Amino acid sequence: MKKIRRLLAVILICVFCVGVCPLASAAEPLPGSTDLYLLSENNSDGQAKLLGKTVTVEGIVTVASGVWHDQVNYFSIVTPRDSYRFGGGTLVYSPGNATQYKVGDRVVVTGTVVNGAYASDKGTTAIRTASSSDIQVRGSGVALPDAYPIYTDPLYEEVELDPGLRFEGMPVRVLGKVSDVAAEGTVRGFYVDGSRDGDYEDGAGRMQVKWYSYSGIESQVSQGDWVVVEGILMQSDASSPYTSGYYIRPSSSAGIQLITQDTVLRLSEAVRQKKDGTAALAGLSVTVHGVAAGPTGQWHESNTAFAMVSPRQTPGLDPVYPSGGLYVYGEGIAQPVARGDALTVTGVLGNAGYDGNVSLTPSTLTVTASEQPVLSEKFIYTDWSREQLQGLESTPVKIKGRVTAIKDTGITRTLTVDGSEDGNTTDGTGTMVVKVYSYSGLSLEGITVGEEVVVSGSLQKEAGAAPVGDYFVRPVEQVGIQRCSEHPARTLYVHLDGFRNDYVQREDWDTPVFDALISGGTRCTNAWGEYVSMTTANMTTLCTGAHTGTHQVPALAFYDKVNDRRVRFLQNYDVATVGEMFGSQGLLVGAIKQRKLQNRGADLFAECGEIAETASQAVQMILHEDPDLMVVLFNETDSTAHKYGTSGPQIQAVVEQIDDALGQILDAYRQRGHAEALNVVLVGDHGMTEVHTNLTSTLSDVLDAVGIPYENAAVNIGPFREDTKLVYNLASGSAEIYFRKPLTQAEYDALIAGLEGITGVARVYTRSELDAMDTPQNLGDLVVDCAEGYAFSTSVAEHGAKAQQQIFMVFNGPTIKQGELYETECRSVDCVANILAVHGVPAEDTVDGAVLNGIYK
């Protein structure tokens, strides 16, 4: 994602002393408003990159006036819940306290970015205002994002460098044991040991919880109590680098909760273990919410026994909290449970189940919904250590390996599988057992020693004295036991970002691999991507087989009318991915660089840099794990053309490097013995044309001339001025215009006439025309489409318009016609539909594509 900043030259050196704010700044303000997520970005010293700049930010107040300081306004603001995937927060320090702010107030703050607004919080990014007039209240009662669970010994890279969540200044939540309580004096609080090492007694890795006597915060905790604490994550490093010294500052007494009878915990908290693998909270009664990963009656004939896991989350739509699983085990089956049932369970934690996992003995069990999606499997290796596997207990996992032993008689039936990380699956070391029961309805029939299998199920461990025994996999569905010999087909699905149709078979360009795949397969000469022709929307389509109108990702960003703000996307689409559809059939999926499949169906994922590294990672994944579906992204053609154009030596070199990388990947399939069963799908997400005229200022001139108040969502992310009626978002080759307020017919007619009169505008699409193109409502009320050679951009080459919607698409495989040109119109959504058909994987209802019968023999 491009993060464009206009960082100005004036630097303010802030002087800190106890109880005193930094001096005022004369720094020139940054234009428009700044996203809190971007404000949270640090330099290598742990300080905000915008240090010393004057910014305007919008956020939600997390703590009322007077709680953190009794003489000035000192509080934190955070991004609202609807944008938590791009979460950020900052402290606000404003002279005086005549104006009072409440939790949930939506405020716009203008001030100088400083490193700590209070002596004890040095290292925490803050905004210092000149006066209370620099804080404007724009609403109240706004919901805050839920506190995010962290360990009390967080690493800097975990809490400040995550690409989607930066926790300094944000609400966090810790669980642990209390020590060193300070109940008197001005500074009060205690320490909590909830460190990742599982030793809650030694005080190593503990975190301070701190407040002041005037705050009104009360606490009844004592030494040795188990507590859950919610508050704002602060930093108190005295000097550079500001990468440690984290503590929690609560905003109210409700943020300090003793774990007593039936306390509600997250599953990831309830399953905390001691160093010996036993339940940390053993003997305590708690309440948890989750989803049944399997039915009752399958793991035990007469007792309640199943795994309960965290609800499956959609990254970008839901806050992505740490997941966990519990082994629910109790005498009798008072309440039958089916896979996918949403549950609320109250019971006692321990290690009392049939297996050695942390267990919950239920006193009450309530089914609140049915047919809910179950947490996706995490791919593991059979030789992973207990430390690597401990956090995955009772959650869905997937292994692939060679069968070294079988026991298919008696009540307990097993496979022993060697899927070790070293790739040697024949030496019998680093194996893991797969268990089913004779009464479970699951069968191992037909499996033989020496063959490869893919097994999905719950990660369990043998019962026994602490430290508890070996891990094994317990399947919950027959589809979770797959013989690789029954799935010989392999598919290489290559995503080519900004790949023009004419990049192959150009004179003097050396692309023998592309040429061979085209001549040995079918090239679709009338293939089209989604409109607008932007990467985020089209890559989402390539990963889901859904039109933008179905997956609701219109572009990189859009204007959200409901919340009056600009919203950006990463993975926020609530439809199944091709990886998830393959996974539902027990098949293995790998992805290289395609982040839209990361945690969304890719069992194996690798992030890469250069093209050579992409090829190397793909080759290693094919040779070692051999996924049924491999998705590889090459984004270099897009970035190179933006900078250098579509015809020079730079783009030629990149295309030839990708050609060479494809050759290496295909050779890996040959080494694996898949040459005869390999399917290859090559597809671009959009085209690319060179730009000779930038229309950005022309668009502004036209909007000025029409006289309708407007704002640019790229400059001001919202909230917007009260009189603003139009908000526009630039997408390079197009501009999306949103009606923030209704227009009169005269205004509408003048706007259309003005936009259509711009030289270089090919067309202005109205909402009814956009509906007919399968686009979502959040794309805009109007879209201004540039003619070829024109764009709202200064890049050498661009996309985003209808002129770049045609795409490169090739199918190659044992059932595909050879040397054919498929001239019937087809769409990028068809790629997933055809990949599913070749593998016999059922398509979800959200797949909009069609099987292209004309490309098959």
Locations of the language-model features?
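Acidic/histidine-rich catalytic neighborhood
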Residues: 677, 687-736
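Active-site nucleophile/metal-coordination loop of metallo-enzymes that catalyze phosphate/sulfate
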Residues: 500-584, 600-602
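Sec-dependent signal peptide cleavage junction
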Residues: 18-29
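Metal-dependent active-site segment of extracytoplasmic phospho-/sulfohydrolases and closely related
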Residues: 493, 513, 657-699, 776, ...
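Active-site neighborhoods of enzymes that stabilize oxyanions during catalysis
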Residues: 719-834
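A long, amphipathic alpha-helix that forms part
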Residues: 612-622, 630, 638-678, 749-760, ...
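OB-fold single-stranded nucleic acid-binding module
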Residues: 28-485
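Bacterial N-terminal signal peptides
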Residues: 10-19
